[in-house]
Each structure stands twice: as C-alpha cells, then as structure tokens.
Amino acid sequence: MKRIATKVCACACALALAASGSAMIGCSGSNSGNDGAQQGATSQQAGYTFTDDLGNQVTVSTHERVVAGMGSFANIWELAGGTLVGASSDAFSDYHIESKAEKVGDFSSLNAESIIALNPDFVILTGASSGRGGGVAQTDLKDALQSAGIPVAYFNVTTFDDYLRMLKTCCDITGDAEAYKDNGTEVAEDIDAIKKKAEGESAGSVAVLTTYSGGTRVQASSTQTGTML
C-alpha cells in the first residue's frame, strides 16, 4: 500500500506542476537548448557535478541541508530520498512535506536572507524569467546565493518527462537508485500502459483554460495538461 501511495504521489507531483506552470513562467519554459539537467553529470570525489536547465554547471558536495524554492520541487527532492531544511510556503500548504523545514517565503517572492540564514548545502530553484504579481524571479537570487558560497541549481519542469529528468538528477545526488525506480521508471511504465489503451481511439478538440487571481490563461499543448490530452 505504501508503494502504491508513493507512486500516486509521484504522478500527482507531475500533474501539480502544470498548475504551477500557469502561475510562473519559468516552470513552463523550455530547457533553453539544454538536453537535460542530468546530461553531462559526473560523479566526483569532491561531490556530484551536473548541468542544470539554464546551462549552469553545479557541484553539490553534500546534501544534508537543502532548500527548495517551489512546493513541487520540495516534493521531488523528498521522493528522491532527500530531506529539507527550508522550502517555499506552498511546500507546506499544498504538498505537506515530511521534512522539518523552515518557510523561506512564497515561491514567487523568496527571501534570500532567510535562505542564507539556514546555511544550506544546496538550493533548488525554478528557472523562471519573471516573478508573479510583482514578485522576485528566482533567477534573481543566483548572485546572492553564489556570493554566499551556496550551490544553486535551476530546473524547468512542466511535463512528466521534465519531472523524470529532474528526479533522476536528484536521485543521482542522493545516491538513491531505488527511489528513481519506484517514483520514476515504474510510474513511467504505468503511464505507457494507460496510453496504449487509448491507441487507435479518435479524439476531439479540447480547449483548456486556467483561471487564477491574475486572469485566465489558455493551456498550450506543451503544458502537462496539454501533453496528457
């Protein structure tokens, strides 16, 4: 039962990213020509080095104290076998993370001082190009965090494939291969089995709209919901 619940959680995480993508531009963005955060990743004696979705080379020497800037990212990190010392407020309200972590602000307006005060080993952020409702883009925190000697990685996650790529990188960092199998490859196999049931079936035209406090947005085929349809 625990295994089933975990796999359902992994699927739910990928679905929730679609909603997050409609609120923050960076989550629904492309990989900027990067074939994946795990590509170019190398294991080194001094830590684990990989290239994030914005093309930055990141080395994580230890991962005992990690901060996640989005609830969905906090969830992915825990699914990869990691624990957190800090996370955005939605990690607690929407994802109910298990880690005993501190809040570091809303995902659209993270507090750099709160993050640095936690003395993190590694910070996971979204590669957003702008904030929401006048908020601060998470990419704007890069210089402050790096000046404090804190490794920071940016991920662009919208579809399940994006989730799978990020999960693989996180599992490589934590060294938990079993977590990737349980929450990654086995979930992918379940999705493929469902897709095969729909092969040969006719499909109509669908318009998907997301309404939030800032207005209404049409979901494109590149979003998680569009990909599912």
Segments predicted by a language model, with ranges:
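Alpha-helical, coiled-coil/dimerization segments enriched in small aliphatic residues
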Residues: 89-93, 217-229
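Flexible loop residues that form catalytic
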Residues: 71, 128, 211
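Acidic/His-rich segments in extracytoplasmic proteins that coordinate ligands and/or metal ions
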Residues: 85-173
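Extracytoplasmic strand-loop-helix segments at the start of, or within, the mature domains
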Residues: 48-53, 58-91
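Bacterial lipoprotein signal-peptidase II cleavage site
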Residues: 22-42
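Extracytoplasmic/secreted envelope proteins and their assembly/folding machinery
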Residues: 60-64, 70-78, 112, 116, ...
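Sec-dependent bacterial lipoprotein signal peptides
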Residues: 1-25
